[in-house]
Amino acid sequence: MATSKLQALWNHPAGPKTIHFWAPTFKWGISIANIADFQKPPENISYLQQIAVTCTGMIWCRCSTIITPKNWNLFSVNVAMAATGIYQLTRKIKYDYVSEAEAAVEIEG
């Protein structure tokens, strides 16, 4: 049973014998690096980098469901990229704008 499933994965059009498997697998490194950056201070976050990560994730999520063969590894890595990019952008926006607004209110008050 396990052998037949493993063989089916190996021979799949988006399996390990193709670029359709390895490209998204290595792309997970970007999402993992973005997750590791959750611990870094928000002032070090780059708007342009996170916008690129977010847009790439969103665009390729759609494309990964249209292409043949369907590549769910590509879809999942791009969902992760979009999610981590949105989270990082949220952290940066809160740091740049919300904390400044709170500081201004405290100064006035």
From Swiss-Prot:
Belongs to the mitochondrial pyruvate carrier (MPC) (TC 2.A.105) family. InterPro entries: MPC. GO terms for biological process: mitochondrial pyruvate transmembrane transport. It comes from the Eukaryota. The chain crosses the membrane at residues 19-35, 51-67, 74-90. This is Mitochondrial pyruvate carrier 2. Keywords: Membrane, Mitochondrion, Mitochondrion inner membrane, Transmembrane, Transmembrane helix, Transport. It is a multi-pass membrane protein. The keyword RNA-binding does not apply. GO terms for cellular component: mitochondrial inner membrane; mitochondrion. It comes from Arabidopsis thaliana. Mediates the uptake of pyruvate into mitochondria. The keyword Transmembrane helix applies. It is found in: Mitochondrion inner membrane.
